[in-house]
Design a protein with these regions (language model features):
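A generic local structural motif
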Residues: 8, 27, 78-82, 109-113, ...
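Surface-exposed alpha-helical segments enriched in charged/polar residues
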Residues: 11, 39, 85-88, 116
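Walker A/P-loop nucleotide-binding motif
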Residues: 17-34
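N-terminal pre-Walker A segment at the start of P-loop NTPase domains
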Residues: 1-13
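Residue-level preference for the first positions of well-ordered beta-strands
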Residues: 17-21, 43-44, 92, 122-124
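Short glycine-rich substrate-engagement loop in P-loop NTPases that contacts/grips substrate
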Residues: 42-89
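Conserved phosphate-coordination/catalytic loops
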Residues: 3, 74-78, 105, 109
Length: 166
């Protein structure tokens, strides 16, 4: 099943469908598949959504204006404009674990900006929310943008705990 989803996702990226949303319960392989797809793209970027949103919000209120995010070049301090330049230029971006925490208004603004900056470019977003709970978690405007692309629902038992029981 995941190979089929990966192939469909690659085709959607090739057709410039964006964003691609992998949704489903905890442990069903969404993040794993997103990372595997990202490995097929040199210079793809993958970040935790809560981490990125928090870092950018902190940068906007810090004296230095720097964002502390591990960068692919080994640097961990980027200005907000450097982060956005890298985010926009990547062939594929993955935002993992959207909606694991409630968003502040500032984080919602940053998320909206991230989605707008990747419009028409490869973007995979993973979330535990379904279509209905997504809008409750991130708001109607952001949910509308997320659902404008393509979605896949991952179903089944938590693969991590199932492996641990064996």
């Amino acid at each position: 099943v995941q190979r089929h989803i990966a192939n469909e996702a690659l085709q959607a990226i090739d057709e410039r469908v964006s964003p691609l949303v992998f949704a489903g319960p905890v442990g069903t392989g969404k993040s794993c598949l997103a990372m595997l797809v990202a490995r097929l793209f040199p210079r793809a970027i993958t970040w935790s959504t809560p981490g990125v949103l928090g870092a950018i919000c902190r940068a906007r209120t810090s004296d230095s204006g720097q964002v502390e995010i591990p960068g692919p070049d080994g640097s961990s301090w980027w200005s907000e404009s450097q982060f956005y330049a890298r985010f926009e230029s990547a062939p594929l971006a993955v935002l993992d674990d959207l909606g694991t925490r409630d968003l502040t208004e500032a984080q919602s603004d940053v998320l909206l900006e991230l989605l707008n900056r990747r419009h028409g470019r490869g973007l995979i977003v993973t979330t535990n929310h379904n279509r209905n709970s997504l809008a409750e978690s991130v708001g109607e405007r952001i949910a509308s943008r997320l659902l404008a692309g393509r979605q896949w629902w991952f179903d089944g038992a938590d693969l991590r705990t199932r492996k641990a029981v064996r």
